[in-house]
């Protein structure tokens, strides 16, 4: 249930009546890895992070995403707000919506007026999708009749330290390239994209060129999130990664992989962790790897299934002035 707590600075804070109960979490494998995330309004709300809800502008919202290879199993909204001292208790309320579904109501009590209040509202994880909006709606009253919605006495201030506590659990997804570049880059994930590049050993010039093409392509997708490409030599990564390998030069964990007869892009499980995926760029030699990298960057490969063969890459037309794709 939704509850309000007292703060040290404002010991007299009214009790908030219960909201809706949190629903049961989605059914997922209990042994899957999970992570706890705290998203504050300072991070995900429009600047400056705090909100002043008024009679004529009663709504405020925050937005957050969810990766396609994860599911939220628990969610809690932690609110810090101060209601106007002129409000009518109980008749004035703060309604909480997730994706336009009502999650609960926080009535304003007499003890809260003009004082900082802390409240918790459980969020039903079954309503959480790939893109989500939490909306706060202020229902304010300062007299029983003949109210002016533009009155300056109608306000409720929501602090920027308010936030969401989320528990994400990783799903064991199939090796399917039809959703590429997911899971190696997921546009729903607003964190910096860290994607290790794994080589059997120090790459030569042609392999450096191939890996640079792939890194540049992923970097263009990352955009404002930023990106990191740690380099590993003959090591297993601890997260989703890109692996470059040829028939003769490959990391030890791919030593039993069958030899290829053409450039191949394949999605496989991490040998020690099925929740981590590896994108293997395989070829007979470095020239094949360069061709596969160009195929990824130019986007003329039909990605589907666990692996695709890059038989040919059509050359790009010469660039014209002012035709940069990101302009």
Q: Residues of each region from the PLM?
A:
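Solvent-exposed alpha-helical segments and adjacent loops
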Residues: 1-327
